[in-house]
Amino acid sequence: MDTLLLARLQFATTTSIHFLFVVVTLGLVTLLVGMQAAWVLTGNPKWERLTRYWGQLYVINYVLGIATGLVMEFQFGLNWSGLSRYVGNVFGAPLAIETLVAFFLESTFLGMWIFGWHRLGKGVHLALLWGVAITAYASAFWIMVANSWLQNPVGYEVRDGIAHLTDFGALLTNPSLGMALGHVVSAALLVGGMLMAAVSAGHLIRRTPDFALFRTSLRIGLITAALAITMVQGFGFAQFGPVGSVQPTKFGGDNPESRALIAEWTTRFGPGDYTPPALASVGLGFMILIGFTLGCVWLLLPLLYRDWIIRLRFPLWLILLGLPLPFVAVILGWISREVGRQPWVAYGLLRTEQAVSPVSAPLMLTSLIGFSLLLGTLAVTNWVLLARHARRGAADPALGRPPAPPSEPAHPEPALI
C-alpha cells in the first residue's frame, strides 16, 4: 500500500477518535460549572448531587481522553517529520503554549477539584472548576490557532526552505480562526447537551428513583442542545465566506478564483491535481443534513411544559436514539475541514506528500494497526465506563463522597483512674 495513504489514514483515525473525547470534555465542563454555581448560590443539595453525578462522567472521559491525545502526539512525531521540519517554528508555538500553559494548568485544577470535595470551601472549590473550564477552552483556542495556520498560513516568511514566524498577532487574527472556533465550541456544547439529555431520558424511561433529579438534567440538556444547534448552524454557515476567500479550492475547483489559484500552483510547483477529494464535499453535505435534523430539538422544548415530554415517553426514546447524531456530525465536519485543504498540509506551502516521514509502507501499516487497536480499546473502554456509571444513577457517586467517619475500636480499653 501507499505510505502516504497509510499516514493519512492514521492521522484521520487518531485525530477523529481524540476529537470525540474533546467535544464531550468541553461540553460537559460548561454544564458542570453552571450546576456547581447553582449549588454554591442556592445551597440546594439537588445541584450538588447533579454536579457529583455528571462530574464523575466528566472525569472518566477526561482521563481516557488524555491517553488518546498521547497516541495522537506519537502519530505526529512518527509520521510527519516533514511538517515539523518545514513549519515547526510557526506551527509549534501555539502547540507549545497549549501544552505548557493550558493543558498542565487544566490538569492541575482538575486534580485539586477532584480531591478538594469536603476539604475546600465551596467558593474555592467552584473557582477550581472555573479554572478547569477556562483552561479547557484555552486549549481549544490554541489548537485551533495552529490548525487555522495550516488552513491559511499567515504571519511567516520562508528562509532557507524553512518557515519562520514573523507576526504572532497574525496567528490570532487569522480569518480562518474566529468562526471555526465558534463552530467547534458550539458543537461541543451540542454534544454535552445531547449527552445529558439522552442519559436523563434513559433514566426517565426506566423510571429510576431519582425522577426529580433527571427531570432537571433533561431540561438542562435539551435547552443547551437547542441553543447550541442554533449556534452551530450560525457559525457553520458564516464560515463559507471567509473559507471561500482564503481557500477557494475547498469547495471544488469550478470557480474563477480556484482556477486562477490552480494555474498559479501549476506554474510554481508543476502539474498535479490541486482539487480536494470528493469526500470533503460529501462529508460536508451529510454534516449539514444532520445539523438540520438536530434542529428539530427545538420542537421538543414545548413538551417540557407540565412534563408532557415524560408523559408521552416517545420523545424520550427519540432523544436517546438520537445521541449518536452529534458525534457523527462533528467527525464529518472535522473530515470536511481537513480533507478540504488537500493536497496541502499547509495550504499553498507544503504538500502532504512532502510532509510525510520517510517510513516504509509495512512499518506504517504496522503502526496504523497498532494505534487503531489501542485507540479503539480506549474508546470502547470509555463508553463502557460511561454507560456503567451513568446507569447506576445519582444515589451515591464516588466523586465527592463524604469521607467515612473514623471507626470506633471494637473493644475500647478501660480508662485509668
PLM feature spans:
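Polytopic transmembrane helical bundles with strong interfacial aromatic enrichment
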Residues: 1-417
